[in-house]
C-alpha cells in the first residue's frame, strides 16, 4: 500500500522512504463507530481516543447527550475542544433531546431555536439521536424546528413500526440503533433507514440482528457501541469486537469488515475514507488474525498511532474548569 501525505496512492509494487513489512497480516480500513456516547466511558474525548485507537478505531460519531444535559453549551464546547488534539477523528452530533424528556430536570434546555444557532456556530456533523419519536410523528412544533436542517439526523425509535415508522422517517431521520430483532431491523431497512447494529455494555444486539444482513441489504448495516464501559473496551475493543462476534456467528468476514468501515463512512457522508483504495485517507488497520483481535498496527492519516496494543501518542486535554463542580445539592 503506497502512502504519501496521509493519502493512499494505490496498492501494488511501490517503494518508499519508509517501509513496513506486515509479514502476511491482514490489511483493512480504519474502523468507524457510528454512534457512541463518550461520557459512558467516564473519560474525556482525548483519553477515549487512547482507549479505542489500539483496537483499530480511527473515526467515531459521538453524541454528547449526557454532558449537554448537565452543562449545556459549555459542555458541548468542552467536548469539541478536547477532541481537537486527538489523532483519531471524533465527529460530534448536536444532541436533539435536552432534556431527554419534558419531565426531566436538567442543567440545560436546547430548544429548536438554540439548535439552529448551535448547528451554525459549531462544527457538528448533524443532529443527534431523535428520541422524541412521538413528537416527530405528531409534528410537534419545536421538534419540527430541530429537524429543519440540512444535515444527518440520527434516529432512536425502539419498536416503532407501521405508519408511525413511516411518519418518523418522513421527518428526515436516516438511521436507527435501537432494533432488538430481525423483523424490526428489516422493516426499518424497508422504510429507508440505515441500521447500526449495537454491541455495547448494557445493550448487546448483534446476536439477534446479524442474521438480518444479506448480500442485498448489506449497504444498509453498520456497527456501533452506543454506550460501552472503559473496562470492556480495554478487554475486547469496540468495533473489532463486533467483527469477532459476527464471524463467530458464521457471518462473512469481508462483509463484517465492510460494515465496520466503508458502510459507516458512507452513512455519515465521510466519503474520503472506509476503503484501501487510491485517494482515500490512509486510515489503516493491520491485524494478524481475521477476527481483528491481534491488531499489530493502526495508522491514521498515514501516521502510526498504535502498535501491539499500545498508543503512539500523548494525551492533550482541553481546559475543563467550565464543566467541573456541576453536582449541586440543595442546602438542608
Give the residues covered by each predicted segment.
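Divalent-metal coordination cores built from histidine and acidic residues
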Residues: 49-154, 216
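Di-metal (Zn2+ and/or Mg2+/Mn2+) metal-binding site signature of metallo-dependent hydrolases
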Residues: 25-49
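Divalent metal-coordination and catalytic microenvironments
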Residues: 1, 6, 24, 35, ...
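Histidine/acidic residue-rich metal-binding segments in metalloenzymes
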Residues: 109-129, 135-197, 203-223, 234-248, ...
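Active-site neighborhood of phospho(di)ester-bond hydrolases with catalytic His/Asp-centered motifs
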Residues: 28-35, 62-65, 93, 128, ...
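Active-site microenvironment of metallo-dependent hydrolases
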Residues: 4, 12, 53-54, 234-250, ...
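Histidine-rich, glycine-flanked metal-binding segment
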Residues: 1-29
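Short, ordered loop/turn segments at secondary-structure junctions
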Residues: 13, 64-67, 95-97, 132, ...
Amino acid at each position: 500500500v503506497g502512502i504519501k501525505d496521509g493519502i493512499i496512492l494505490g496498492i501494488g509494487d511501490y517503494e518508499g522512504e519508509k517501509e513496513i513489512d506486515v509479514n502476511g497480516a491482514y490489511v483493512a480500513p480504519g474502523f468507524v463507530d457510528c454512534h457512541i456516547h463518550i461520557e459512558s466511558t467516564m473519560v474525556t474525548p482525548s483519553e477515549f481516543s487512547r482507549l479505542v485507537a489500539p483496537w483499530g478505531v480511527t473515526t467515531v460519531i459521538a453524541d454528547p447527550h449526557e454532558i449537554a444535559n448537565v452543562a449545556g453549551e459549555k459542555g458541548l464546547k468542552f467536548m469539541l475542544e478536547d477532541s481537537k488534539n486527538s489523532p483519531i477523528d471524533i465527529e460530534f452530533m448536536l444532541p436533539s433531546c435536552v432534556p431527554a424528556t419534558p419531565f426531566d430536570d436538567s442543567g440545560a434546555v436546547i430548544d429548536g431555536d438554540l439548535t439552529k444557532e448551535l448547528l451554525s456556530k459549531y462544527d457538528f456533523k448533524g443532529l443527534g439521536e431523535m428520541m422524541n419519536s412521538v413528537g416527530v410523528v405528531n409534528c410537534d412544533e419545536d421538534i419540527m424546528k430541530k429537524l429543519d436542517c440540512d444535515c444527518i439526523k440520527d434516529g432512536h425509535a425502539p419498536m416503532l413500526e407501521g405508519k408511525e415508522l413511516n411518519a418518523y422517517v418522513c421527518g428526515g431521520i436516516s438511521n436507527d440503533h435501537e432494533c432488538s430483532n430481525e423483523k424490526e431491523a428489516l422493516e426499518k431497512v424497508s422504510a429507508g433507514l440505515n441500521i447500526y447494529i449495537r454491541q455495547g455494555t448494557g445493550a448487546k444486539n448483534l446476536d439477534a440482528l446479524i442474521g438480518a444482513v444479506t448480500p442485498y441489504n448489506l449497504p444498509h448495516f453498520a456497527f456501533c457501541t452506543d454506550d460501552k464501559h472503559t473496562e470492556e473496551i480495554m478487554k475486547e475493543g469496540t468495533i473489532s469486537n463486533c467483527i469477532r462476534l459476527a464471524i463467530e456467528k458464521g457471518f462473512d468476514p469481508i462483509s463484517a469488515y465492510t460494515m465496520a468501515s466503508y458502510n459507516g463512512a458512507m452513512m455519515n457522508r465521510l466519503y474520503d475514507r472506509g476503503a484501501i483504495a487510491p485517494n482515500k485517507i490512509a486510515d489503516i488497520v493491520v491485524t494478524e488474525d481475521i477476527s481483528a483481535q491481534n491488531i499489530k498496527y493502526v495508522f491514521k492519516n498515514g501516521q502510526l498511532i498504535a502498535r501491539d496494543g499500545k498508543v503512539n501518542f500523548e494525551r492533550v486535554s482541553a481546559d475543563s474548569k467550565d464543566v467541573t463542580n456541576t453536582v449541586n445539592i440543595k442546602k438542608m
